[in-house]
A protein has these predicted regions:
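Short, surface-exposed amphipathic charged segments that create phosphate/polyanion-binding patches used
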Residues: 173-177, 225-230, 259
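Local cysteine-cluster metal-coordination motifs and their immediate loop/turn environment
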Residues: 127, 194-195, 216-250
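Ferredoxin-reductase
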Residues: 2-94
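SAM/dcSAM-binding transferase cores
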Residues: 246, 253-261
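FNR/FR-type flavoprotein reductase catalytic core
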Residues: 84-220
Length: 261
């Protein structure tokens, strides 16, 4: 876990993926060396006030955005437009300034010589992309990704959509147990909506498979001060609230108290 630092960096390139998704690329070798898969940055458009479409919804807070890619100082943030904060970010172009606090949080543990299943849903895709690049040369990987529709789907090994517009129809966890058995999986990594993560955790608990999940939570400060992102972690008999921004966002799935959300 790093000590998050505040910086301003110019956007080098903006990549349009679809009507809903885009990537902002920055360049910083020091930040690149500090980042790890599963970590995130709190980011905000420096011109947030100007870019706000409604004066009553000015995006003052930073948005927690996971690291999508990180190679030699070239850092990417894959973002979905869902509210005023991300819409303000979507209006930035090359040369515009981005405010960053990070890298923050604890990332995924990295293993070698394992059979690994990655499972992601929706905007849970970006941290998995960075993770698979770190794992692929030393492990056997299989990646399942699910989304509501075709526009939520990106490159992976197995695709699931709620509406069946591409890949298999259903929820991504529907095929999880079969893949664990077929590919003799040792470890599962996951990131996505809370119901998906809870179901994935139920499956790995039943099959006694090691499982690390990345949780998403509303954040205010993003540096562990406000405790606004705390989630219940621990055993059923002895649990406590842990901060997603500090102790997380990655936790052992078996330690997350899903029933308390």
């Amino acid at each position: 876990m790093n000590n998050p630092q505040y910086r301003q960096r110019a956007i080098q390139y903006r990549e349009e993926l679809s009507d809903d998704y885009f990537i902002l690329w920055i360049w910083d070798e020091a930040l690149g060396a500090a980042g790890r898969p599963g970590q995130f940055y709190e980011i905000r458009a420096l011109a947030s006030l100007k870019n706000a479409s409604n004066v009553n919804k000015i995006p003052k807070l930073f948005k927690p955005i996971s690291i999508y890619d990180n190679q030699g100082g070239r850092i990417g943030f894959m973002i979905k437009k869902v509210g005023e904060g991300t819409i303000a970010l979507s209006k930035l172009r090359a040369g515009d300034m981005l405010e960053l606090i990070g890298p923050a949080g604890n990332g995924f543990p990295i293993y070698r010589g394992k059979r690994i299943l990655l499972i992601s849903g929706g905007i849970g895709y970006p941290p998995m992309w960075y993770l698979q690049k770190e794992l692929i040369n030393h492990n056997q990987l299989y990646w399942m990704h699910g989304g509501a529709k075709q526009g939520d789907i990106f490159p992976c090994d197995e695709i699931w959509t709620d509406d069946g517009s591409i890949g298999r129809k259903g929820r991504v966890c529907d095929g999880m147990a079969a893949n664990i058995s077929k590919n003799e999986i040792d470890i599962v990594y996951s990131c996505g909506p809370l119901p998906m993560l809870a179901e994935a955790s139920r499956i790995t608990n039943e099959l006694e498979i090691e499982h690390y999940c990345s949780l998403e939570s509303y954040m205010a400060c993003g540096i562990g001060v406000c405790h606004g992102c705390a989630v219940p972690i621990g055993s059923k008999e002895a649990w406590d609230y842990k901060r997603v921004c500090k102790e997380g966002p990655v936790f052992k799935a078996e330690e997350v108290r899903w029933e308390l959300f």
